[in-house]
Amino acid sequence: MEAAADGPAETRSRVEKDSRRAIKDSPAKTQSPAQDTSIMLRNNADTGKVPALPEHKKKRKGYSPAESVKILRDWMYKHRFRAYPSEAEKRMLSKKTNLSLSQISNWFINARRRILPDMLQRRGNDPIVGHKTGKDAHATHLRSTDASVPAKSGPRGSDNVQSLPLRSSPKGQMSGEKIPEPGSAPSQKLTMIAQPKKKVKVSNITSLSSPEPVSTEEYADFSSFQLLVDAAVQRAAELELEKKQESNP
């Protein structure tokens, strides 16, 4: 058992010694990166460690070429209302862009979230030129609104000024009131303006008030009617007494 256990340890030590001798004997200038990596792989295979690749050989996250992206953007803009290419269309785009089907599918998945909403808001025919975003778009929007407000509000104000005398004149004609002359006293103007206000107040109070109470005259009429009934009853009793007296002399 001890001899079997010492066997692998001796072989590992021999391999490490041989590799060290080979590295020392070979000149450093003549060694290529491939030879270095092969030696590292051999040493790590013997020791059971995973090799670490050099930094210049690490795979970087690649991006699609600009020409391929332009072709895909053009296709998406033309079909922006149905940006779901079929399998045949994906194969056609892969031939034009020299990209794989998986790359095209991934590009469309990301583009539908990031690029398509901006494309749907455009009105032109250029899929590359985008709208202004951020502070520039907000500033242009404010300028456009400020410029459009006076243009819209100007004629409306003049129409309101011209329509005021037309609306106020029929009231005086229908009510029969005379329009005061420009040289009249200001007190007359105030009284004429105050009269409709008083009427409006009275009408509001009467409309919001409770039902009209019964006047006191109705109670007086009822009491007099009761008195008349009592007097008639007494008169009838007196007449009966008189008849009885006449019948019994």
UniProtKB/Swiss-Prot annotation:
Polar residues bias locations: 28-46, 159-172
Ranges annotated as biased composition (Basic and acidic residues): 9-27
Family from the record: Belongs to the TALE/TGIF homeobox family.
Transport in keyword set: no
Taxonomic placement: Eukaryota, Metazoa, Chordata, Craniata, Vertebrata
Compartment(s) where it occurs, according to its Swiss-Prot or TrEMBL record: Nucleus
A Gene Ontology BP annotation from the UniProt entry: negative regulation of transcription by RNA polymerase II
GO molecular function, one term: DNA binding
Gene Ontology CC terms: nucleus
Keywords: DNA-binding, Homeobox, Nucleus, Transcription, Transcription regulation
Described purpose of this protein according to its UniProt entry: May have a transcription role in testis.
Domain of life: Eukaryota
Region of interest: Disordered: 1-65, 126-199
Organism: Macaca mulatta (Rhesus macaque)
Major location (coarse): nucleus
Annotated region of DNA binding: 55-118
Annotated Gene3D superfamilies: Homeodomain-like (1.10.10.60)
Keyword check for Transcription: yes
Descriptive protein name: Homeobox protein TGIF2LX
